[in-house]
Regions:
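Catalytic Walker B motif of ABC-type/P-loop ATPase nucleotide-binding domains
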Residues: 162-165
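Conserved ABC ATPase signature
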Residues: 137-141, 145
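The feature captures the beta-strand-to-loop junction immediately N-terminal to the Walker
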Residues: 40-42
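Conserved ABC ATPase "signature" region
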Residues: 115-133
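Conserved ABC transporter NBD signature motif
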Residues: 63-71, 83
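Helix-to-loop junction immediately C-terminal to a conserved catalytic motif
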Residues: 55
């Protein structure tokens, strides 16, 4: 189903510890273009630490991370999104302004020309079912609506891969099903996905394949 000769994203033998306590040991993961890959593991197993290294918040003590065959530590942090990396943190991360301006504000940073910026904003409002919320301040949105808004913003740069850190956490079952549909919509746009969760069913419903983390590395 997916070409397995050239990963769009690779974690190769990554290790990390805090205060002498190992968090990750020689962790290796591959994501190929267009596929949705899950990382399953309990809270505290290192999933968020892995993503923080991918976006440059932390540095690994050993191993390498590659984005489109380029060592990610050779790509300046502010250019990683232009190289095709998108990231959705677990915590709510929106601006205290309207839904429309939340998307347009990011578009103005990333895209040239006000008409192009407005066009992509309208397109993403449609794609993620946000048109009816466009004038609302993002601070009043529900958990599921916040997730859809964050997904819309991360797609502005048309990333090659999106890292989703526990996007289904603290959501009601019906909202989880709704957000799963939008995760698959991102994949249908041609974007690969690496998504973490501690619930096996949540990943089973969306992932083409999954890695299981335990004892600081992949165990299955």
């Amino acid at each position: 189903k997916f070409k397995k000769d050239n990963p769009i994203f690779e974690v190769r033998d990554i290790s990390k510890s805090f205060d002498g306590r190992p968090i990750l040991k020689k962790l290796s993961i591959k994501v190929f273009p267009g596929e949705c890959v899950g990382i399953l593991g309990p809270n505290g197993c290192g999933k968020t630490t892995l993503f923080s290294m991918c976006i440059g918040e932390q540095n690994p003590e050993g191993g390498k991370i590659y984005l489109n065959n380029k060592a990610i530590d050779q790509i300046p942090i502010h250019l990683r999104s232009k190289e095709g990396l998108g990231y959705l943190p677990q915590q709510r991360s929106v601006f205290n302004m309207s839904v429309y301006d939340n998307i347009l504000g990011i578009a103005q940073i990333s895209i040239k020309g006000i008409e192009n910026q407005k066009a992509i904003t309208e397109k993403l409002l449609d794609e993620f079912n946000l048109q009816h919320l466009r004038s609302l301040n993002a601070s009043v949105l529900s958990g599921g609506e916040i997730r859809r808004l964050m997904m819309a913003r991360v797609m502005i740069n048309k990333p090659k891969i999106v890292l989703l850190d526990e996007p289904l956490a603290a959501l009601d079952p019906l909202v989880i099903q709704d957000i799963q549909k939008y995760i698959l919509k991102i994949q249908s746009m041609g974007t690969a996905i690496l998504v973490t969760d501690h619930n096996v069913k949540n990943l089973f419903d969306i992932a083409d394949r999954s890695y299981v983390l335990g004892e600081h590395t992949v165990i299955a």
